[in-house]
From Swiss-Prot:
This is Vacuolar fusion protein MON1 homolog A. InterPro entries: FUZ/MON1/HPS1_longin_1 (IPR043972), FUZ/MON1/HPS1_longin_2 (IPR043971), FUZ/MON1/HPS1_longin_3 (IPR043970), Mon1 (IPR004353). PANTHER family: SAND PROTEIN-RELATED, VACUOLAR FUSION PROTEIN MON1 HOMOLOG A. Plays an important role in membrane trafficking through the secretory apparatus. Not involved in endocytic trafficking to lysosomes. Acts in concert with CCZ1, as a guanine exchange factor (GEF) for RAB7, promotes the exchange of GDP to GTP, converting it from an inactive GDP-bound form into an active GTP-bound form. The modification Phosphothreonine is found at T61. Residues 1-87, 114-147 are annotated as: Disordered. GO terms for biological process: protein secretion; protein targeting to vacuole; vesicle-mediated transport. Keywords: Guanine-nucleotide releasing factor, Phosphoprotein. The modification Phosphoserine is found at S31, S56, S91. GO terms for molecular function: guanyl-nucleotide exchange factor activity. Belongs to the MON1/SAND family. Residues 1-12 have a biased composition (Basic and acidic residues).
C-alpha cells in the first residue's frame, strides 16, 4: 500500500499574525517549552507504527491530486489566473444562492407543491427526509413556514449532488425541495470550470460556502461556524469517502460513465443514517479534527494481553483485527507491511456506531476502505463480545467466503481473553471509559487535547462542567476548531496561540511532533497557562503506556 508522502509545509515559515474577527484576544507566543526535544514527547515511544505515516494535519487532509482541498494559496506562489469578466454574473448567481439560504421559504414551498417534475421524485426507499414533522390539518401554511424557518436556522448544511445536478444527499430537508439550490451550486462550478478555473470557497453574508469536486460528485458545505474553509473541505472529503466506503470508487465511476444523469439515491437508499451519524460525530468528536484515534485508558499489561490474543486468533485472509469501545481504540493488530489510515478507521467507527443491529449477532458486510484501496471491497466481521457491553470486535478480511473462519477467530479470541483474565479487566475499564481532568492536578485546567503525530493517537479527558450540555460541548469543540484553523492556516500558520474569551481561555501549541490544545478558567493568566504546560506534559508522559498503544503487534 502506498503511504501518504510527508511534505514540508509552510509551517516551517516564520509565524504570521492574524487579526481576530470576533472581538476576542488572540496572541502569538514563543515556544512554551523550548527545551523539549523531538522524539521525547509523550507518545513518541511507540514501537513500530499502526497507521499510515502522517505527521501533520496537511498530510492527512491531502487529496489525491496532491493539494489540500480548501487550502489558501502559499505566500510567494503564483496566484490564480485572472477571473473572467463575467465575475459579476457569478456574484449575482451567488447572491441568488445566498437569498435562497436566508430566505428559502418561497423556494421550498414552490418545490413542495404537487405537480413537481417527475425527474426529482423519490425512488422506492429514497433518502430524502422532511425537515420537520408533516403539517397538521388546518395549520399547513403556518407549519410550512415554521419548517423552513427551522431549516434556515441550522449552522451548517451539507449537500451532495452529481455533476449533472442530480441531488444525492442533503443534511437537512428533502433533496427535491432543495433541487433549485443545488442547481445554482452546480451552475457556479460548471461556469468557472468552463474558463479553466476552480471554485473552492465563497465568503459572503456571514456564510462560508465550500466546494469539493470529486468527479462524478460535487460536495458543498454552507456554514456559519468557526471552521476554516480547509476544515469544512476536510469534512466534505469525509462524506465523499463515506460514499466510497459503500460503493467503491470503481463502481461509482462506472455508474456515471454509463449514465451521467443517474440518480445515485437508488443505490444509497437507506444509508442516509450513516452519513447523518458521521456529521453528528464530526460535530462533537475531536478525533476527526485531530486526524487521529483515541485509546481507551487501559493498563499496559491488559492491553498487551488483548493485542496478543488478537494476534493469535487469526485467519489467512485477515488484514486488520480491531477491538474498540465507544469509538475508542482498545487494540489493533495488522498484517505486516499493511497500514490503516486514520480516515478509514474513523469510517469503520462510524459504520458501527450508526446501527444498533450489530449488537444482535455476528454481521458480515462488504466495506471499502477508500484511503487503503478505493477500487474494491473488503469484508468486515462485526460483533459485540457481549450484548450488554460496548466492546466491539472488528475483523477485516480479503475473502468474502471466509465468514466461518473469521467467526472462529472471534471464538478463539474470547477464549484467550477469559483464560488470561483480561475479560474482567476490560469490563472494569469500561466503567470509567474516560479519565477526569482533575487527575492531572492543575486547578484551572478544564480540558485538553494532546496528539502524538508519530503514533497517530491522541488523548483527552472527559468533558466535564461547565460543558455538560450538548450545546456547550459543541461550543468547546468549535473553539478548538477555531484555534486549529489558525494553527494550520495554509498561508500563515501559527505555532503557538493564546486565546482569551469571556467564558474560558485557551492555548494552542503545534510542533512537528505533537499538537496540544488546552482550555482553562478565564481567571487564569497566560503565565499560569504556560507553566501548566510543563506539568501537563509530564503527567501525559507518566501515563502514556495507559493512554497510548506503545507496542502494536502484526500478524
Amino acid at each position: 500500500m502506498a503511504a501518504d508522502m510527508q511534505r514540508k509545509r509552510s509551517s516551517e515559515c516564520p509565524d504570521g499574525t492574524l487579526t481576530p474577527s470576533d472581538g476576542h484576544s488572540v496572541e502569538r507566543a514563543e515556544s512554551p517549552t523550548p527545551g523539549l526535544a523531538q522524539g521525547m514527547e509523550p507518545g513518541a515511544g511507540q514501537e513500530g507504527a499502526m497507521f499510515v505515516h502522517a505527521r501533520s494535519y496537511e498530510d492527512l487532509t491531502e487529496s489525491e491530486d496532491g493539494a489540500a482541498s480548501g487550502d489558501s494559496p502559499k505566500e510567494g506562489a503564483r496566484g490564480p489566473p485572472p477571473l473572467p469578466a463575467d465575475m459579476r454574473q457569478i456574484s449575482q448567481d451567488f447572491s441568488e444562492l445566498s437569498t435562497q439560504l436566508t430566505g428559502v421559504a418561497r423556494d421550498l414551498q414552490e418545490e413542495m407543491l404537487p405537480g413537481s417534475s417527475e425527474d426529482w421524485l423519490d425512488p422506492p426507499g429514497a433518502v430524502g427526509r422532511p425537515a420537520t414533522e408533516p403539517p397538521r390539518e388546518g395549520t399547513a401554511e403556518g407549519d410550512e413556514e415554521d419548517a423552513t424557518e427551522a431549516w434556515r436556522l441550522h449552522q451548517k448544511h451539507v449537500f451532495v449532488l452529481s455533476e449533472a445536478g442530480k441531488p444525492v444527499y442533503s443534511r437537512y430537508g428533502s433533496e427535491e425541495a432543495l433541487s433549485s439550490t443545488m442547481g445554482v451550486m452546480v451552475a457556479l462550478v460548471s461556469f468557472l470550470e468552463a474558463d479553466k478555473n476552480a471554485i473552492r470557497s465563497i465568503h459572503a453574508d456571514g456564510y462560508k460556502v465550500v466546494f469539493v469536486r470529486r468527479s462524478p460528485l460535487v460536495l458543498v458545505a454552507v456554514a456559519r461556524t468557526r471552521q476554516s474553509a480547509q476544515e469544512l473541505a476536510q469534512e466534505l472529503l469525509y462524506i465523499y469517502y463515506q460514499i466510497l466506503s459503500l460503493l467503491t470508487g470503481a463502481q461509482l465511476s462506472h455508474i456515471f460513465q454509463q449514465k451521467q444523469n443517474y440518480d445515485l439515491r437508488r443505490l444509497l437508499s437507506g444509508s442516509e443514517r450513516i452519513t447523518d451519524n458521521l456529521l453528528q460525530l464530526m460535530a462533537r468528536d475531536p478525533s476527526f479534527l485531530m486526524g487521529a484515534a483515541r485509546c481507551l485508558p487501559l493498563a499496559a499489561a491488559v492491553r498487551d494481553t488483548v493485542s496478543a490474543s488478537l494476534q493469535q486468533a487469526r485467519a489467512r485472509s485477515l488484514v486488520f483485527s480491531i477491538l474498540l469501545a465507544r469509538n475508542q481504540l482498545v487494540a489493533l493488530v495488522r498484517r505486516k507491511d499493511q497500514f490503516l489510515h486514520p480516515i478509514d478507521l474513523h469510517l469503520l467507527f462510524n459504520l458501527i456506531s450508526s446501527s444498533s443491529s450489530f449488537r444482535e449477532g455476528e454481521a458480515w458486510t462488504p466495506v471499502c476502505l477508500p484511503k487503503f484501496n478505493a477500487a474494491g471491497f473488503f469484508h468486515a466481521h462485526i460483533s459485540y463480545l457481549e450484548p450488554d457491553t460496548d466492546l466491539c470486535l472488528l475483523f477485516v478480511s480479503t475473502d468474502r467466503e471466509d465468514f466461518f473462519a473469521v467467526s472462529d477467530c472471534r471464538r478463539r479470541f474470547q477464549e484467550r481473553l477469559r483464560k488470561r483474565g483480561a475479560h474482567l479487566a476490560l469490563r472494569e475499564a469500561l466503567r470509567t471509559p474516560y479519565y477526569s481532568v482533575a487527575q492531572v492536578g492543575i486547578p484551572d485546567l478544564r480540558h485538553f487535547l494532546y496528539k502524538s503525530k508519530s503514533s497517530g493517537l491522541f488523548t483527552s479527558p472527559e468533558i466535564e462542567a461547565p460543558y455538560t450540555s450538548e450545546e456547550e460541548q459543541e461550543r468547546l469543540l468549535g473553539l478548538y476548531q477555531y484555534l486549529h484553523s489558525r494553527a494550520h492556516n495554509a498561508s500563515r500558520p501559527l505555532k503557538t496561540i493564546y486565546y482569551t474569551g469571556p467564558n474560558e481561555n485557551l492555548l494552542a501549541w503545534v510542533t512537528g511532533a505533537f499538537e496540544l490544545y488546552m482550555c482553562y478558567s478565564p481567571l487564569g493568566t497566560k503565565a499560569s497557562a504556560v507553566s501548566a504546560i510543563h506539568k501537563l506534559m509530564r503527567w501525559i508522559r507518566k501515563e502514556e503506556d495507559r493512554l497510548f498503544i506503545l507496542t502494536p503487534l502484526t500478524y
